[in-house]
Amino acid sequence: MKTLLLTLVVVTIVCLDLGYTMTCYNQQSSEAKTTTTCSGGVSSCYKKTWSDGRGTIIERGCGCPSVKKGIERICCRTDKCNN
């Protein structure tokens, strides 16, 4: 019985990949590339793009936020996928 419980715990840890943290780009527009380590179990990165009087604005970060009409949003689920 103990062996079965230990096996289940090991399988759970392997399947859940406990301790994994997502890394996303977080630079804005044309700034130099920077990254951030996401917290709180966040498992996606985003890139939002929109235009205003100054030109095209790009925002990057962790998560997958909702956006207003006229803002293009791309969400992805691998490290540094939001370039």
From Swiss-Prot:
Signal peptide: 1-21
Disulfide-linked positions: C24-C45, C38-C62, C64-C75, C76-C81
A GO term from the CC aspect: extracellular region
GO molecular function, one term: ion channel regulator activity
Distribution of this protein across tissues and organs: Expressed by the venom gland.
Entry's localization field: Secreted
InterPro entries: Snake_3FTx, Snake_toxin-like_sf, Snake_toxin_con_site, Toxin_cobra-type
Keywords: Acetylcholine receptor inhibiting toxin, Disulfide bond, Ion channel impairing toxin, Neurotoxin, Postsynaptic neurotoxin, Secreted, Signal, Toxin
PROSITE patterns for the chain: SNAKE_TOXIN
Family stated for the protein in its record: Belongs to the three-finger toxin family. Short-chain subfamily. Type I alpha-neurotoxin sub-subfamily.
Role this protein plays: Binds to muscle nicotinic acetylcholine receptor (nAChR) and inhibit acetylcholine from binding to the receptor, thereby impairing neuromuscular transmission.
Protein name according to UniProt: Short neurotoxin 1
Species whose genome carries this gene: Oxyuranus scutellatus scutellatus
